[in-house]
């Protein structure tokens, strides 16, 4: 292989790894910020906060809330990070057991569907604190992460084609792509170690292990896919070289 082709091929492989890493993280963020997953993750945090709410004991005060609903249409639940307004009609149709889930679902729906009146990038510049955190977890954030993922997948396809084009023989490009995927997939072991280190030395939110699991699963899938593609690439390359020798 000519020296300039080697340089270009190495550059494209490095670029492929970088693009794949960004794609993986954007896909993970998109996965975490679906409304269904957010309700699960936010539920764990909010249940802890609801139990420690100073102004209201939800489990013991459910009867009191029903009494208050005789004189007003909406009840406001004061949480540390956000006040949640719940229609009394929903409270009356719930039970003491399901009321906590009602608060969680109402909270997530309000935050997730909130109109921030700015694009994701401009919101990053304008917002701060709690509002910025809410925006990152909202549908605005979810749509942005999904768009980034799709854009980088398109770039990956282009760079993948360039890797095949620069490889000699071109059929070896499959092997090169597979090895690149394995390199990124090795992040699984790095984050596995980081998870063990973090959870054993730092006090974290109860949802942190679940968030790590999503990221680890995606890295593991990538690692396994890389191994499979590399094996296919070596087999195809071996078959190609064998045919060339026979001819």
Question: What is each residue range found by the language model?
Answer:
Residues 25-34, 236-244:
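Juxtamembrane/interface segments at transmembrane-helix termini
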Residues 202-214:
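Short, membrane-exposed interhelical loops at transmembrane-helix boundaries
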Residues 35-139:
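Long, solvent-exposed extracytoplasmic domains/loops
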